[in-house]
Amino acid sequence: MIHNNRLRIVMQKNWKLSNDSKDLLARCGIKINLYKKKLIAFSENMPIVYICVRDDDIPGLIMDGIVDVGIIGENVLEEEVLSRKLRSDNIDYIKLKRLDFGTCRLSLAIPLDKTYKDISCLNNSRIATSYPHLLKKYFDKNNITFKSCMLNGSVEVAPRAGLSDAICDLVSTGATLEANGLREVQVIFRSKACLICKVGDISSEKRNVLNTLLTRIQGVIKARESKYIMLHAPIKRLEEVVQLLHGAERPTILKLAGDNTRVAMHMVSSETLFWETMENLKLLGASSILVLPIEKMME
């Protein structure tokens, strides 16, 4: 029996989104033992219970107010919203935070030997997909008539099997499309994982836990987006160095022993450091450049 005073978080039970969700919560300092076949688990150090379900069940559990919080892909969320609108079901939820994983896109793809100029080439085509409502929304917006072939998996084999003329499926790298003789021609929806919660009363105890969780998630994401930079820079080029690094705050400047022309600079950079940036730092006279990951960060 799940105690009502625990914050109930629901997330995908399998696949990569599940692993990324567990990793995020672990980085937030929440201790939990979620084994592969264990679908319910209690946090050891916070009043939280985790429930693992199929990803397409998560939006409904939130919208119906059965659980408090969910981690879900925006593609699944929006598909369920459109589906529930047709059934006149409740679609209320609050999006608390867009997360930094689960990046993918829902795209149209056609066989390599098929000619494509624009979306009108697919007029009156049969499209295989697991996302019929998102597909219909996009085609209706573009005044395209189509016939759908609903598949819950292996969508990419549909054209070769003679089931469809094209497909509408999730794409991450495009390798699966290429392996099945398909090419991506149009992105119709871009998606990331997001944190959502139910609309309605949440007890003050649960609200406090949720606020703590949100603060920690923000800290984890900010840390992953930032780097700690240490370098030596000429005093006369200091402002140019600072402008190049886009620091979250002004840098810490330290004197160097026995050198009046250079200083040591420490700062948190809010942008990813590419090799080109480091090479430009070198051109400005910087040396001993160190770029370090940040484990945790709180502003």
Curated annotation (Swiss-Prot):
<comment type="similarity">
    <text>Belongs to the ATP phosphoribosyltransferase family. Long subfamily.</text>
</comment>
<keyword id="KW-0808">Transferase</keyword>
<dbReference type="GO" id="GO:0000105">
    <property type="term" value="P:L-histidine biosynthetic process"/>
</dbReference>
<dbReference type="InterPro" id="IPR020621">
    <property type="entry name" value="ATP-PRT_HisG_long"/>
</dbReference>
<dbReference type="Pfam" id="PF08029">
    <property type="entry name" value="HisG_C"/>
</dbReference>
<keyword id="KW-0479">Metal-binding</keyword>
<dbReference type="InterPro" id="IPR011322">
    <property type="entry name" value="N-reg_PII-like_a/b"/>
</dbReference>
<keyword id="KW-0547">Nucleotide-binding</keyword>
<keyword id="KW-0328">Glycosyltransferase</keyword>
<protein>
    <recommendedName>
        <fullName>ATP phosphoribosyltransferase</fullName>
        <ecNumber>2.4.2.17</ecNumber>
    </recommendedName>
</protein>
<dbReference type="InterPro" id="IPR001348">
    <property type="entry name" value="ATP_PRibTrfase_HisG"/>
</dbReference>
<dbReference type="InterPro" id="IPR013115">
    <property type="entry name" value="HisG_C"/>
</dbReference>
<dbReference type="InterPro" id="IPR013820">
    <property type="entry name" value="ATP_PRibTrfase_cat"/>
</dbReference>
<dbReference type="InterPro" id="IPR015867">
    <property type="entry name" value="N-reg_PII/ATP_PRibTrfase_C"/>
</dbReference>
<dbReference type="GO" id="GO:0005737">
    <property type="term" value="C:cytoplasm"/>
</dbReference>
<dbReference type="GO" id="GO:0005524">
    <property type="term" value="F:ATP binding"/>
</dbReference>
<keyword id="KW-0963">Cytoplasm</keyword>
<keyword id="KW-0028">Amino-acid biosynthesis</keyword>
<keyword id="KW-0460">Magnesium</keyword>
<dbReference type="GO" id="GO:0003879">
    <property type="term" value="F:ATP phosphoribosyltransferase activity"/>
</dbReference>
<dbReference type="GO" id="GO:0000287">
    <property type="term" value="F:magnesium ion binding"/>
</dbReference>
<keyword id="KW-0067">ATP-binding</keyword>
<comment type="pathway">
    <text>Amino-acid biosynthesis; L-histidine biosynthesis; L-histidine from 5-phospho-alpha-D-ribose 1-diphosphate: step 1/9.</text>
</comment>
<dbReference type="InterPro" id="IPR018198">
    <property type="entry name" value="ATP_PRibTrfase_CS"/>
</dbReference>
<comment type="subunit">
    <text>Equilibrium between an active dimeric form, an inactive hexameric form and higher aggregates. Interconversion between the various forms is largely reversible and is influenced by the natural substrates and inhibitors of the enzyme.</text>
</comment>
<comment type="function">
    <text>Catalyzes the condensation of ATP and 5-phosphoribose 1-diphosphate to form N'-(5'-phosphoribosyl)-ATP (PR-ATP). Has a crucial role in the pathway because the rate of histidine biosynthesis seems to be controlled primarily by regulation of HisG enzymatic activity.</text>
</comment>
<dbReference type="Pfam" id="PF01634">
    <property type="entry name" value="HisG"/>
</dbReference>
<keyword id="KW-0368">Histidine biosynthesis</keyword>
